[in-house]
């Protein structure tokens, strides 16, 4: 696999080729995922839950994100590396720039921000200064207490229209990629068709331009609750390398996610 760039992902959308993404937090797994063909590695603030044992992502610091980004960058040769901007690290355009600068210096090639049109000024500020941005709409885990828990978003008409509107606004502000999390299949398909940029889904059905999973979910490393949208690829293969190859294959073929992993 040649080196993946934002231009590569855009061409994949245009050519109707599915994008495979997965979270990574260290050099060893980053190399494994990179070697087996994952296109995108996300250093997710999900590390606050799957590595640190927290109930949400809110306590993750910029320093921790920088550390894990540096680790992943050392292990990956070809995949596009995206780093999450942690909670309350992008409240103003200037703070956003300072956080993004640290993550990019650590090896990220794009930063991800959760939220809607209120981020547009910060997105423009970053893109003007050479920082590619990934948006994130639907279930945004940093807003878990606003939502009242980890719940599917966009099921009523008003909420669906608002997510659609915000997706268009973020695109016009300059994002080059969008993550859609836990939204109904029909809404995800509508947004994917409307946007010029690639849309990566998690719990958003098969119509998006690609899929992302938390690596622990893909390997069945869970502590009780298993989200509907996940699949244990390790259980089917018994080998981590084979598990990631199967994940990449099923995303590429469009067989994952299936109806049992999606919301209506």
UniProtKB/Swiss-Prot annotation:
Gene3D superfamilies: Phosphoenolpyruvate-binding domains (3.20.20.60). The active site is at 181 (proton acceptor). The gene is panB. Its EC number is 2.1.2.11. Homodecamer; pentamer of dimers. GO terms for molecular function: 3-methyl-2-oxobutanoate hydroxymethyltransferase activity; magnesium ion binding. Disulfide bonds: none annotated. Pfam families: Pantoate_transf (PF02548). Its cofactor is Mg(2+). Keywords: Cytoplasm, Magnesium, Metal-binding, Pantothenate biosynthesis, Transferase. Pathway: Cofactor biosynthesis; (R)-pantothenate biosynthesis; (R)-pantoate from 3-methyl-2-oxobutanoate: step 1/2. 3-methyl-2-oxobutanoate binds at residues 45-46, 84, 112. Belongs to the PanB family. Mg(2+) binds at residues 45, 84, 114. Binds 1 Mg(2+) ion per subunit. It comes from the Bacteria. It catalyses: 3-methyl-2-oxobutanoate + (6R)-5,10-methylene-5,6,7,8-tetrahydrofolate + H2O = 2-dehydropantoate + (6S)-5,6,7,8-tetrahydrofolate. Catalyzes the reversible reaction in which hydroxymethyl group from 5,10-methylenetetrahydrofolate is transferred onto alpha-ketoisovalerate to form ketopantoate. GO terms for cellular component: cytoplasm. This is 3-methyl-2-oxobutanoate hydroxymethyltransferase.
């Amino acid at each position: 696999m040649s080196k993946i760039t934002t231009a590569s992902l855009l061409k994949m959308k245009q050519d109707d080729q599915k994008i495979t993404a997965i979270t990574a937090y260290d050099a060893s797994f980053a190399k494994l995922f990179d070697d087996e063909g994952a296109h995108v590695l996300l250093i997710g603030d999900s590390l606050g839950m799957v590595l640190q044992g927290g109930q949400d992502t809110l306590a993750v610091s910029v320093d921790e994100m920088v550390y894990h980004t540096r680790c992943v960058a050392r292990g990956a040769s070809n995949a596009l590396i995206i780093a999450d901007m942690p909670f309350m690290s992008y409240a103003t355009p200037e703070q956003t720039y300072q956080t993004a600068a640290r993550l990019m210096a650590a090896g990220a090639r794009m930063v991800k921000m959760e939220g809607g049109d209120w981020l547009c000024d910060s997105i423009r500020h970053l893109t003007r200064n050479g920082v590619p941005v990934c948006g994130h709409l639907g279930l945004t885990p940093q807003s878990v207490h606003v939502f009242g828990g980890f719940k599917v978003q966009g099921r009523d008409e008003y909420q669906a229209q608002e997510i659609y509107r915000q997706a268009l606004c973020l695109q016009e502000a300059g994002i080059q990629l969008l993550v859609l999390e836990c939204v109904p299949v029909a809404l995800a398909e509508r947004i994917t068709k409307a946007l010029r940029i690639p849309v990566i889904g998690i719990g958003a059905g098969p119509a998006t331009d690609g899929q992302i999973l938390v690596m622990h979910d893909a390997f069945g490393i869970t502590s009780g609750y298993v989200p509907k949208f996940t699949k244990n690829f390790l259980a089917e293969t018994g080998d981590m390398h084979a598990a990631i190859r199967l994940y990449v294959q099923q995303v590429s073929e469009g067989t994952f996610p299936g109806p049992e992993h999606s919301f209506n």
